[in-house]
From Swiss-Prot:
Tissue specificity remark: Low levels in roots (e.g. in cambium) and barely expressed in stems, shoots, flowers, siliques and leaves.
Name this protein carries in UniProt: Cytosolic calcium-binding protein 3
Annotated signal peptide: none
Function: Binds calcium Ca(2+) and may act as a signal mediator to buffer Ca(2+).
Gene Ontology biological process terms from the UniProt entry: abscisic acid-activated signaling pathway; cellular response to gibberellin stimulus; cellular response to sucrose starvation; response to abscisic acid; response to calcium ion; response to cold; response to glucose; response to mannitol
A GO cellular-component term linked to this record: cytosol
């Protein structure tokens, strides 16, 4: 008895879905397309939020860098800036 009722309910549900699809196939297609777009947007969001290998390496370097290394790096940057400024001064003096 219960099996017959379940089969009847299932067949009625299938008929309702088939009727909806047959009456409004464009709506079903649009809903599927919208769902696909949402899925793709979610995947894209996850991809863009994932840190790149380069970013991870930079973070790892920052963590492992000692204060002495930071001072040395800052000194090298300053020396580079001074050298560039000297070159500009020499060029202006030549003119």
């Amino acid at each position: 008895m219960a099996t017959v009722e379940v089969e009847h309910v299932t067949s009625v549900a299938v008929e309702i879905v088939e009727t909806e699809v047959n009456q409004h196939p464009e709506e079903v297609f649009v809903e599927d397309a919208e769902k696909t777009n949402e899925d793709e947007e979610e995947k894209a969001a996850v991809i863009t939020e994932t840190p790149t290998v380069v970013e991870e390496e930079k973070k790892a370097e920052e963590v492992t860098e000692t204060p002495e290394e930071k001072k040395t790096e800052a000194l090298e940057e300053k020396q580079t800036e001074v050298a560039a400024a000297e070159e500009v001064a020499v060029e202006k003096a030549k003119e």
